[in-house]
């Protein structure tokens, strides 16, 4: 009887050790859970960025306003009936 209690005690200790400290145990589970949360948050940010880029691409393909806005901001272009004034600071 005493041998059986010792055997089951050691068996319980072995399983508890492997659960808490062993490979694929509690620590690995917690680390994997944190990694999944981090990657999920990163995916949400990337999806939002992709939606903005897709909307901008769609606007550039179908609309004239976005193309005109890009020409004005990036290339400093003006229409034929407009005047462009550049104010240069005194440094």
UniProtKB/Swiss-Prot annotation:
Q: Give residue spans on the Periplasmic membrane side.
A: 22-91
Residue ranges the record marks as coiled coil:
27-76
Question: What are the annotated GO cellular component locations?
Answer: cell division site; cell septum; plasma membrane
Q: Which UniProt keywords apply?
A: Cell cycle, Cell division, Cell inner membrane, Cell membrane, Coiled coil, Membrane, Transmembrane, Transmembrane helix
Localization annotation: Cell inner membrane
Q: State what this protein does.
A: Essential cell division protein. May link together the upstream cell division proteins, which are predominantly cytoplasmic, with the downstream cell division proteins, which are predominantly periplasmic.
- What is the protein name for this chain? Cell division protein FtsB
Per the UniProt record, the source organism is: Haemophilus ducreyi (strain 35000HP / ATCC 700724)
């Amino acid at each position: 009887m005493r041998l059986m209690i010792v055997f089951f005690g050691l068996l319980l200790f072995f399983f508890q050790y492997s659960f808490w400290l062993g490979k694929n145990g509690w620590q690995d589970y917690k680390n994997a859970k944190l990694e999944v949360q981090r990657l999920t948050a990163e995916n949400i940010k990337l999806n939002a960025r992709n939606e903005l880029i897709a909307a901008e691409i769609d606007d550039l393909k179908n609309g004239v306003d976005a193309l005109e806005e890009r020409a004005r901001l990036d290339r400093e272009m003006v229409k034929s009936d407009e005047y462009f004034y550049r104010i240069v600071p005194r440094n």
